[in-house]
Swiss-Prot record:
Residues 1-22, 64-92 are annotated as: Disordered. It comes from the Eukaryota. This is Non-histone chromosomal protein 6. One of its GO terms (biological process) is DNA repair. Keywords: Chromosome, DNA damage, DNA repair, DNA-binding, Nucleus, Transcription, Transcription regulation. GO terms for cellular component: chromosome; nucleus. InterPro entries: HMG_box_dom (IPR009071), HMG_box_dom_sf (IPR036910), HMGB (IPR050342). DNA-binding protein that induces severe bending of DNA. Required for DNA-binding by the FACT complex, a general chromatin factor that acts to reorganize nucleosomes. The FACT complex is involved in multiple processes that require DNA as a template such as mRNA elongation, DNA replication and DNA repair. Also augments the fidelity of transcription by RNA polymerase III independently of any role in the FACT complex. Pfam families: HMG_box. Weakly associates with the stable SPT16-POB3 heterodimer to form the FACT complex.
Length: 92
């Protein structure tokens, strides 16, 4: 292989029927607040939106984060259940 060339990765393709991963508390917060941040800061880049969302998340106290953490916990349980059903269905 010549210098600077990359080896093609041979990662297995993801099954489209596999259950979607659970979202974190931050992701629930970001999804809910992304449009608000964009409206308050028109014309900012995708990366800047992420930075602002991160700053807002860090500024929240644990009481304000609780609803998002509860959603994340519920989504994690959903994912675990769907993952178990998927594994059972595909192991046969």
């Amino acid at each position: 292989m010549a210098p600077g060339e990359r080896k093609k990765s041979s990662r297995k393709k993801k099954d489209p029927d596999a259950p979607k991963r659970s979202l974190s508390a931050y992701m629930f917060f970001a999804n809910e607040n992304r449009d608000i941040v964009r409206a308050e800061n028109p014309g900012i880049s995708f990366g800047q939106v992420g930075k602002l969302l991160g700053e807002k998340w860090k500024a929240l106290n644990s009481e304000d984060k609780l609803p998002y953490e509860n959603k994340a916990e519920a989504d994690k349980k959903r994912y675990e259940k769907e993952k178990a059903e998927y594994a059972k269905k595909n192991s046969a």
